[in-house]
From Swiss-Prot:
This is High affinity immunoglobulin epsilon receptor subunit alpha. Disulfide bonds join C49-C91, C130-C174. It comes from Rattus norvegicus. Residues 1-23 form the signal peptide. Tetramer of an alpha chain, a beta chain, and two disulfide linked gamma chains. Interacts with IGHE (via CH3 region). Keywords: Cell membrane, Disulfide bond, Glycoprotein, IgE-binding protein, Immunoglobulin domain, Membrane, Receptor, Repeat, Secreted, Signal, Transmembrane, Transmembrane helix. Induction: Exhibits night/day variations with a 15-fold increased expression at night in the pineal gland. Up-regulation is due to a large degree to the release of norepinephrine from nerve terminals in the pineal gland and cAMP signaling pathway (at protein level). One of its GO terms (cellular component) is plasma membrane. Gene3D superfamilies: Immunoglobulins. Residues 224-245 are cytoplasmic. High-affinity receptor for immunoglobulin epsilon/IgE. Mediates IgE effector functions in myeloid cells. Upon IgE binding and antigen/allergen cross-linking initiates signaling pathways that lead to myeloid cell activation and differentiation. On mast cells, basophils and eosinophils stimulates the secretion of vasoactive amines, lipid mediators and cytokines that contribute to inflammatory response, tissue remodeling and cytotoxicity against microbes.
Length: 245
């Protein structure tokens, strides 16, 4: 019996199984283009499902407000958003777990504070902007956090918050002029939270590695013990042969 070949086969199977486990733990991810989770009626938005590099067509499942959609491609294009397009979106690429939900809010407002996220990881980033209905020009825009003005812009330009800290958590809104009429957006809360996924990723890497190491050590010990046992048997057989002689 080729014990060496069997052991190598077992080791290969374990490594393959670990690879499958790691792949299976990967989730699909929903992203928006443009990135705003708050949009106005009539806006165009594309939801993108990222998960793998599969070239297979119709390999994506979309779920909107717990109902499976007829859309099967990785890109779901909403040409002119309506209130009915609001809600929870989940996607699943073939061979991957379902994504975390993304919530899209379609609103009817004269002035809207748009944001790329409502929850941001510590040291992450997010964007905000003051947007008017039908893309009318907004002038003399002032951005507020917790009712305190922190940014003035003559035009409605994007504001990017990079390396966000817990101090960036708060309630945001904006004011601006539409045709010489001052308008105010509703308030929107953004929370900066601690990133626990880094610790989880380390665990994902450590446990499979430990399993492989333990298997290799166990296999090595088995071979060592097996060889010692064979040597003892040979010595015993040799001793018996000499006695008979």
């Amino acid at each position: 019996m080729d014990t060496g070949g069997s052991a190598r086969l077992c080791l290969a199977l374990v490594l393959i199984s670990l690879g499958v486990m790691l792949t299976a733990t990967q989730k699909s991810v929903v992203s928006l283009d443009p990135p705003w989770i708050r949009i106005l009626t009539g806006d165009k938005v594309t939801l993108i499902c990222n998960g793998n590099n599969s070239s297979q067509m119709n390999s994506t499942k979309w779920i909107h407000n717990d109902s499976i959609s007829n859309v099967k491609s990785s890109h779901w294009v909403i040409v002119s958003a309506t209130i009915q397009d609001s809600g929870k979106y989940i996607c699943q690429k073939q061979g991957f777990y379902k994504s975390k939900p993304v919530y899209l809010n379609v609103m009817q407002e004269w002035l809207l504070l748009q944001s790329s996220a409502d929850v941001v990881l510590d040291n992450g980033s997010f964007d905000i902007r003051c947007r008017s209905w039908k893309k009318w020009k907004v002038h003399k825009v002032i951005y507020y956090k917790d009712d305190i003005a922190f940014k003035y812009s003559y035009d409605s330009n994007n504001i990017s918050i990079r390396k966000a800290t817990f101090n960036d958590s708060g309630s945001y809104h904006c004011t601006g002029y539409l045709n010489k009429v001052e308008c105010k957006s509703d308030k929107f809360s953004i929370a900066v939270v601690k990133d626990y996924t880094i610790e989880y990723r380390w665990l994902q890497l450590i446990f499979p590695s430990l399993a492989v190491i333990l298997f290799a050590v166990d296999t090595g010990l088995w071979f060592s013990t097996h060889k010692q046992f064979e040597s003892i048997l040979k010595i015993q057989k040799t001793g018996k042969g000499k006695k008979k002689g």
